[in-house]
């Protein structure tokens, strides 16, 4: 919060929850630990931070805001989807792609899969299983790599 910023009420609260982006590759290379119901504030911080960077970014993992928890978020249009403890259980149709990341400089080559199936817990910590394809699948793979300490 900056004095004289003109922000009031809830705008100040949201601005306070926007977290700086972690750029320390040694920290980003650490595998995240499982998330619990005690980590809902981390998910809220991810929502606020992703919204603040929506012109540059479509997904984030908790370690990108300095929290080593297994939580990711991604945007599908205006909707933000949070996944706790996501794991890819099935993948098919590999392809090569260059990706960028707010935490890293430039773009890097990586392999992604056109189709994936993910098991995860939703925001109510209900177990879910969902299949994704295309660009959304690519985003999810990138963010799960973050949780696993894999840097593109």
Each PLM stretch: what is its role?
Residues 1-11:
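Positively charged, low-complexity/disordered segments
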Residues 10, 15-152:
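Positively charged
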